[in-house]
Amino acid sequence: TGKWYQNPDGTYYVNGFADIDGTTYSFDKKGYMQTGWVEKGVKDYYFNEDGSYDPSKKRPMIALTFDDGPGEYTETLLDTVEKYNIHVTFFMLGQNVEGRESTIQRMVKLGCEIGNHTWDHPEQTLPNMDLDSVMQEFQKTDDALVKACGQASTVCRAPYGAITDEQMSAVGKPFFMWSTDSLDWKLMDADADYNQIMNDSSLGDGSIILMHDIHEPSVKCATEKLIPALIDQGYKLVTVSELAEAKDVTLQSASYSDFWDSSLQAGRVAGYAGNSSDSEDSSEDGSDGSDSSDGSDVSDGSSDEGDYSDGSDESDYSDGSSDDGSYDDGSYDESYDDGSEEY
């Protein structure tokens, strides 16, 4: 039970947002007024206990990304993804696809994003390879992904974060760096991984976290500590593309390392990777190195503790009666409670 709104003609607002006497409300498919966070696409809107929309609250978002899989621990990670109903991005190696098709299909089913991390994570950085070889690295992986789950990657990450503008343009997809590096390939300890991430002063709304799902301590950190902690702090965990869309960024064939408000306001979200070719030490198992992202020229992110910041734009709402213009025929009970319901 809950509150609902009856029009003079006996109809009810249902299934969407409605502007009533200058105040915006949200109603579920049964016509009950919604409170708290309400999702509309990839965006979230906050409605007070009286049902009124509060534009001063913005739900902070972070994108968790995992490189070099899929591996033997990926299913454990997906169990947690499913448990908390979150989305993450997997930047996969094509050579690891065969034999783990069901895992990749599960990623897609759970709403995770499929990313391309080349075929075999070549030790030679991409800027030192000819264009045909680079294209083959990404194309072979996409071919394997299509065979495994019926779709190619939507986003890419270069090994060591190193790629030239020409190569990136030829691949023709958005490339993602990161703003917080877990150093999990080096630390190999769940507690240390967690502390490395949470002690990053730039961690906040719009951050992109780099981890690897091929290491057991990394997955243990993510499933037992990091994901629950970020959710407790109020963060919504989304894919990199969802994060971009929520921030009203149209992805291009460019390089992205964060979607902080400071970066958005300064107009420096989309970049080019030609200067980000510093190579890092690679681990013995082929995972990546340690250097931080190319976001060093970006000021640190807001909302370190996951507090809500102000300034969401009320213009996202139309002034119509509801999203789909639908009304109920008034058959619901008229009594109600006053409650609400490695690189």
Task: List each model region and its residues.
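Extracellular adhesion/carbohydrate-binding repeat motifs centered on closely spaced tryptophans
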Residues: T1-R59
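A mature extracytoplasmic/lumenal domain signature
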Residues: G10, K29-G31, G51, D68-P70, ...
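Active-site beta->alpha N-cap acidic-glycine motif
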Residues: G51-M129, V134-K140, A144-K147, A152, ...
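Structural recognition of the beta-strand scaffold that forms the well-ordered cores
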Residues: A63-F66, V88-M92, E113-T118, S153-A158, ...
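C-terminal domain-boundary segment and adjacent tail
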Residues: K83-Y84, N96-E98, P217-D278
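Alpha-helical scaffold elements lining the catalytic groove of polysaccharide deacetylases
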Residues: P122-C149, A162-D205, V219-A222
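Active-site-adjacent pocket scaffolds in enzyme catalytic domains
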Residues: T154, G172-K186, Q196, S202, ...
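Ser/Thr/Gly/Pro-rich low-complexity, disordered linker/stalk segments of secreted
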Residues: W260-Y343
